[in-house]
Amino acid sequence: MGMPNLGDMMKQIQKAGEKMQDVQNQLEKLVAHGESGGGMVKVSVSGKQKLLSLRIDPEIMDDAEMVQDLVIAAVNNALDASAALAQEEISKAAGGMINPADILKNMNLGK
């Protein structure tokens, strides 16, 4: 059995790097949504887990503690959805060659 061709290995590494850059770009475009309190608080986050929008039903604004709890729950819900979308994109790009959870951790997006 011969030694692997170093040139071919370098090409594969370069292709993998290009795929991961494509995934990074895709994650910027993905939007995940979360809500709590039956829709009284709604949030949207990017695939890179940046908060994009926050909507709070004005009817609940008198109860600050409840608003805080609902915002936290909605944000966490959206972040979980965002992480799932990111893992799905990485899995598609990797074609089973790598563990998406490891990539998310390296991108500071995993738990």
From Swiss-Prot:
Quote the cellular component terms of the Gene Ontology held in the record: bacterial nucleoid; cytosol
Gene3D superfamilies according to UniProt = Nucleoid-associated protein YbaB-like domain
Q: Which residues cross the membrane?
A: none
Bridged cysteine pairs (disulfide): none
Instruction: Please tell me whether the keyword DNA-binding is annotated for this protein.
Output: yes
User: By its UniProt entry, which InterPro entries does this protein fall under?
Assistant: YbaB-like_sf (IPR036894), YbaB/EbfC (IPR004401)
Recorded GO terms, molecular function?
A: DNA binding
Q: Which domain of life is it from?
A: Bacteria
Its annotated compartments are:
Cytoplasm, Nucleoid
Where primarily located? cytoplasm
Keywords, A to Z, come to:
Cytoplasm, DNA-binding
Q: What is the stated purpose of this protein? A: Binds to DNA and alters its conformation. May be involved in regulation of gene expression, nucleoid organization and DNA protection.
Which PANTHER family does its entry note?
NUCLEOID-ASSOCIATED PROTEIN YBAB
User: Which proteins does it associate with, and in what oligomeric form?
Assistant: Homodimer.
Family according to the record: Belongs to the YbaB/EbfC family.
Q: Under what name is this protein listed?
A: Nucleoid-associated protein Clim_0875
Q: Which organism is it from?
A: Chlorobium limicola (strain DSM 245 / NBRC 103803 / 6330)
